[in-house]
Amino acid sequence: MELTVVQREILQELINLYREKNRPIKGTEIALRLNRNPGTIRNQMQALRALDLVDGVPGPKGGYVPTSKAYRALGLEDEGEIIVPIYKDGKKVEGVKVVKIEFDTVSHEKCCSSKIHIEGDTKHFNIGDIIRVGPTYHNKIIINGKIIGRDDIHRILLIDVLGVSSIPNIKVGDVGIKEVWTINPNCTLRETAKLFAEKYISGAPVVDNDKLVGVISLHDIAENIDNIDKKVKEVMRRDVITIHKDEKIYDALKIMNKNNVGRLVIVDDNNKIVGIITRTDILKIISGKFPENFHT
């Protein structure tokens, strides 16, 4: 879509003001910001409305609001704008994104409500719809709720919060187990089981000549309990899944789920083992139990 320089300038300022004030913006406010004649702004707004880039809100508190098409016309999403989605009936609602989340009645004994400010058409949603908001970018916050109100003018969904979850924005290298015990591939399962019992661990990397060659767990030993004197190299898992120390625990969970594993070996820039992180470690962190050596 080809816009004139003036149209792009006005549209960008409308978006800036709308983000700042979160309400319909009057033409006089845009004129004041751009040092332009209000009549010029009014004429250009008519053209922008015809292009479906701007919606007009009537009434004393009315004004102009940008449509989702306006953001695309200015290439804002293509420049890396973070999209926080909304899902309804398990499907992502296209053309709608969350720009602000507010919690109220948090001290109420029997309920908690939230105001979900969006960009896009609120008419995609109806009272009683069950929705999922998120995850947000930074802390991967996900909110599940039931819509109990809708403000079409200010583009707000009022929901009864059914549940909230969050995955802290923490590097695996900051919370992983740093005291790593490794196993030689020529050790027997009996020797490995003894080490696991002494060190209170349930798995370990297998290292040969400083090279990571596999991983062995209590589950592997249990499956071979009738052959307890087998060598580790005969039963270890060879497709070792690693994660860089600077990756986040959210990324670790995704890798674990994708590869159906319960632990990852943490490595540094030189692919040297610097720790281990398990699914249990992550669940403890999500529940608020951080390791004693945690630091950021």
UniProtKB/Swiss-Prot annotation:
Domain of life: Archaea
The keyword Repeat is assigned to this record: yes
Annotated ranges, domain CBS: 176-232, 236-292
UniProt GO MF annotations: DNA binding
Keywords from the named record: CBS domain, Repeat
One Pfam family matching this protein: CBS
GO BP annotation list: regulation of DNA-templated transcription
Alphabetical list of Gene3D superfamilies matching this protein: CBS-domain, Winged helix-like DNA-binding domain superfamily/Winged helix DNA-binding domain
CDD domains named among the record's database cross-references: CBS_pair_archHTH_assoc
UniProt-listed InterPro entries: CBS_dom, CBS_dom_sf, Diverse_CBS-Domain, UCP005063_CBS, WH-like_DNA-bd_sf, WH_DNA-bd_sf, WHTH_HrcA_DNA-bd
Keyword Repeat belongs to the record: yes
Name of this chain's protein: Uncharacterized protein MJ1232
Species for this entry: Methanocaldococcus jannaschii (strain ATCC 43067 / DSM 2661 / JAL-1 / JCM 10045 / NBRC 100440)
